């Protein structure tokens, strides 16, 4: 393959395979890379290259993840695949691999299984916006009615968790046959790729979203005023614009009178940049780490939310013992810890290290948050859990 085929100017989209163990997620991942490499160039990955997933650490949690990439005519995709169920749980909750859309793999020979359901639920909780279904192993099912039945079951399950089950794309294929080079089944991989291109919208870039910067530090500069520093998470702030300081205390409105980076003055600060923002009429003691600087009205402070949490195992450096209702750890958001209490789901008395659990958290001070915000749970500075805000309550 000639080298110059690979262009970085295509839109970039993050996807991944999810679904029950042994339903063919890794085989499908290999098949996609092989079939698309034939058609559009790029690297083909073999099954065992993907299956030997390297260990990564995200917020102190050990996760095995394989990353592959592939191209279609119009897009470049980064694709994650995990070997084990626990890796999926951790990956989705920590946001180690943010997905703009997921390919749910369901074996036609089995239909939906317990982890199929759990991955759909997790996808809903952590805010994966789009699902495409790949019904795998269809070469092993001769009965058309059985295929219809499995498809119906999967669609109903997705609808149950608020995905548009009736409308989302379902592809019937055989990852193994496609990987072996069977042209008819390769066609199904192309069909899947077409759905990726058309069903998952191009993700909004961080720079196009409303301005937000978590405040890391606050300085007072004689004769100039108060400067807050941090890395711009999203959007752009221009000199002269009104911004809000949100979280911990009452929301305050102020004007950004200067932006500097590496001691140079700029007209604006953009997503991804580490900046200092000079704020008009704000006292040093009125601002603190853990608040955010944001476009007015774009984000609100909250104290109560439903979350999905993964509790670190003892081996990962987490707790050695379970915790119970009334547990009061620190919740670390962006740049600071806030104490909070938890409510466990009905019928759940305790949570063991290594579990994942839905819990309602009430913080003692408000934090600027939206659904999808990630956090860590800490005890005395050591991380014992990772979570994501599934939905804000108050």
UniProtKB/Swiss-Prot annotation:
Residues 10-204 form the tr-type G domain. SUPFAM superfamilies: EF-Tu/eEF-1alpha/eIF2-gamma C-terminal domain, P-loop containing nucleoside triphosphate hydrolases, Translation proteins. Its EC number is 3.6.5.3. Residues 19-26 are annotated as: G1. Mg(2+) binds at residue 26. Residues 136-139 are annotated as: G4. It holds the Pfam family GTP_EFTU_D3. Residues 60-64 are annotated as: G2. CDD domains: EF_Tu, EFTU_II, EFTU_III. It catalyses: GTP + H2O = GDP + phosphate + H(+). Keywords: Cytoplasm, Elongation factor, GTP-binding, Hydrolase, Magnesium, Metal-binding, Nucleotide-binding, Protein biosynthesis. GO terms for cellular component: cytosol. It is found in: Cytoplasm. Residues 81-84 are annotated as: G3. InterPro entries: EF-Tu_GTP-bd, EF-Tu_GTPase, EFTu-like_2, EFTU_2, G_TR_CS, P-loop_NTPase, Small_GTP-bd, T_Tr_GTP-bd_dom. GTP hydrolase that promotes the GTP-dependent binding of aminoacyl-tRNA to the A-site of ribosomes during protein biosynthesis. NCBIfam families: EF-Tu, PRK00049.1, PRK12735.1, PRK12736.1, small_GTP. PANTHER family: ELONGATION FACTOR TU, MITOCHONDRIAL (PTHR43721:SF22), ELONGATION FACTOR TU-RELATED (PTHR43721). Monomer. This is Elongation factor Tu. It comes from Aeromonas salmonicida (strain A449). The gene is tuf1.
């Amino acid at each position: 393959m000639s080298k110059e085929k690979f262009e970085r100017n295509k839109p970039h989209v993050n996807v991944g395979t999810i679904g029950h163990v042994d339903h063919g997620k890794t085989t499908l991942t290999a098949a996609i890379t092989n079939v698309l490499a034939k058609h559009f160039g790029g690297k083909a990955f073999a099954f065992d290259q993907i299956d030997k997933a390297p260990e990564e650490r995200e917020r102190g949690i050990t996760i095995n993840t394989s990353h592959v990439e592939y191209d279609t005519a119009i897009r470049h995709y980064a694709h994650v695949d995990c070997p084990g169920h626990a890796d999926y749980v951790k990956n989705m909750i920590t946001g180690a691999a943010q997905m703009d859309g997921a390919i749910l793999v369901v074996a036609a020979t089995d239909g939906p299984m317990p982890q199929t359901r759990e991955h759909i639920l997790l996808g809903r909780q952590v805010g994966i916006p789009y699902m495409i279904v790949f019904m795998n192993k269809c070469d092993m099912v001769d009965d058309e009615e059985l295929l219809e039945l499995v498809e119906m079951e999967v669609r109903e399950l997705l609808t149950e968790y608020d995905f548009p089950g009736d409308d989302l794309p379902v592809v019937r294929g055989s990852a193994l046959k496609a990987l072996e080079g069977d042209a008819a089944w390769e066609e199904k991989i192309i069909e899947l790729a077409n759905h990726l291109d058309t069903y998952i919208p191009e993700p909004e870039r961080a720079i196009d979203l409303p301005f937000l910067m978590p405040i890391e530090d606050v300085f007072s500069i004689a004769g100039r005023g108060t400067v807050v520093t941090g890395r711009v998470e999203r959007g752009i702030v221009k000199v002269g614009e009104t911004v809000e300081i949100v979280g911990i205390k009452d929301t305050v409105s102020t004007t950004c009178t200067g932006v500097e980076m590496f001691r140079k003055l700029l007209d604006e600060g953009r997503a991804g940049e580490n900046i200092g923002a000079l704020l008009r009429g704000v006292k040093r003691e009125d601002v603190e780490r853990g608040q955010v600087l944001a476009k007015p009205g774009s984000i609100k402070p909250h104290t109560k939310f439903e979350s999905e949490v993964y509790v670190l195992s003892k081996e990962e450096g987490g707790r050695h013992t379970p915790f119970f209702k009334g547990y009061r750890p620190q919740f670390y958001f962006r740049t600071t810890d806030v104490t909070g209490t938890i409510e466990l789901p009905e019928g759940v008395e305790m949570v063991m290290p290594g579990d994942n659990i839905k819990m309602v958290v009430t913080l003692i001070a408000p934090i600027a948050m939206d659904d999808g915000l990630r956090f860590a749970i800490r005890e005395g500075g050591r991380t014992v859990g990772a979570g994501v805000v599934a939905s804000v309550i108050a």
